[in-house]
């Protein structure tokens, strides 16, 4: 029996929990189980604070997100969000009786006010056995990350509602600095792999002036600053066709505008077999120190049509794994959580959407144990590799602690 290791508190991280609406609080609760397990194993303290957003905030606080909640989010190390909104006909009523406030306004305000400019959505098969659940053929081997610009473009441009004239308009606007920073985010992510991943930039440069600026700026940034990276430009309509016909052809990092990213990421969401498997991260800076401020949430909605304990928590748990890696400087823990999720999927410990019979909480209950197991195996492997590395260094006359290139 191994001697018990007494852990001491080495750090404290504040995480704001925005459960949101319908299934949102349920899936957040399962991610918290995993995060508490990580904290216990690592000696890190996670301080959680629950706040309201979306319809829940409208009904209790009169607006989809309050200034007080925004201020608390700004001061946190990271944010986890469940889901916002409900069915199209859901009516949200403020304490003073108004029904004209929409839950989604809270999420848009959160993204804009906290400058969460880069939305990352990984898309891959967690297990080959899930391929048959996808409505698309040829999904095996698919592995890409969509990087969507999140605080610019048509969603935040000048808007003119129909005033009775029968005319309405929305304006798509992008500036060079906005495009530069999202291009650098894509390049950074591509360079985290060996060899570096190709970058795909999606636009509509044959029609839109904003897309021509987008293409010109992305080309310049990657050519001047990241010449080692492969850059491919693709028109958005052509890219949409490729993702249906042969999604693995676009493996790598996909970068695109706010509206195009919104559409293409929803299209890509059918590839893994269920929306309940897709995590996301929205970052305010490059995660070059693994401490970027971010908002982490599943790609699925609030599922108002499903009953309690039926929603797949994996997307939210994988979002927590992304948070560990990008915002909390705990990459090994994030890797262990991802490995545990894949093991659970392989073992069939899943919700009904991907062929299992487990409830939301049953999936969440099992993952902390699997995460600890994956973490121990990873540490053991790294110790073996480190030992071999030191032996090799001694044989070739290098100091055991020196770096090699």
UniProtKB/Swiss-Prot annotation:
Keyword line: Amino-acid biosynthesis, Branched-chain amino acid biosynthesis, Cytoplasm, Leucine biosynthesis, Magnesium, Manganese, Metal-binding, NAD, Oxidoreductase
Any one of the GO BP annotations: L-leucine biosynthetic process
Origin superkingdom: Eukaryota
Residues the entry annotates as binding NAD(+): 86-104, 301-312
EC number: 1.1.1.85
Pfam annotation, one family: Iso_dh
Protein family: Belongs to the isocitrate and isopropylmalate dehydrogenases family.
Record's protein name: 3-isopropylmalate dehydrogenase
């Amino acid at each position: 029996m191994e001697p018990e290791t007494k852990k001491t508190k080495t750090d404290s991280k504040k995480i704001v929990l925005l459960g949101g609406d319908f299934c949102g609080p349920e899936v957040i609760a399962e991610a918290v189980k995993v995060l508490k397990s990580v904290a216990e194993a690592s000696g890190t303290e996670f301080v959680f604070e629950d706040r309201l957003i979306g319809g829940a905030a409208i009904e209790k606080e009169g607006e989809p997100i309050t200034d007080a909640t925004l201020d608390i989010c700004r001061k946190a190390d990271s944010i986890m969000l469940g889901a916002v909104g409900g069915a199209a006909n859901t009516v949200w009523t403020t304490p003073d009786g108004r029904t004209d406030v929409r839950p989604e306004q809270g999420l848009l305000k959160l993204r804009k006010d906290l400058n969460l400019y880069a939305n990352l959505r990984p898309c891959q098969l967690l297990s080959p056995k899930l391929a048959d659940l996808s409505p698309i053929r040829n999904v095996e081997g698919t592995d890409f990350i969509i990087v969507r610009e999140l605080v610019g473009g048509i969603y935040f441009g000048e808007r003119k509602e129909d005033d009775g004239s029968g005319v309405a308009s929305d304006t798509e606007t992008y500036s060079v600095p906005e495009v530069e920073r999202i291009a650098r985010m894509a390049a950074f992510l591509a360079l985290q792999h060996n060899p570096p991943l190709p970058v795909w930039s999606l636009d509509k440069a044959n029609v839109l002036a904003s897309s021509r600026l987008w293409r010109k700026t992305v080309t310049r940034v990657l050519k001047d600053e990241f010449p080692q990276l492969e850059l491919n430009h693709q028109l958005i309509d052509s890219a949409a066709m490729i993702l249906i016909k042969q999604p693995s052809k676009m493996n790598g990092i996909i970068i695109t505008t706010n509206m195009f990213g919104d559409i293409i990421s929803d299209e890509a969401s059918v590839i893994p077999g269920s929306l309940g498997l897709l995590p996301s991260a929205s970052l305010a800076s490059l995660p070059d120190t693994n401490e970027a401020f971010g908002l982490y949430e599943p790609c699925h909605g609030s599922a108002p049509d499903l009953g309690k304990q039926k929603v797949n928590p994996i997307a939210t748990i994988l979002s927590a794994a992304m948070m560990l890696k990008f915002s909390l400087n705990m990459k090994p823990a994030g890797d262990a959580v991802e490995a545990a999720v894949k093991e659970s999927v392989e073992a069939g410990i899943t919700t009904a959407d991907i062929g299992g019979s487990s409830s939301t909480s049953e999936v969440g209950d099992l993952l902390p144990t699997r995460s600890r197991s994956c973490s121990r195996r990873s540490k053991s492997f790294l110790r073996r590799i480190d030992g071999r590395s030191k032996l090799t260094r001694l044989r070739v006359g290098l100091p055991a602690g020196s770096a090699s290139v």
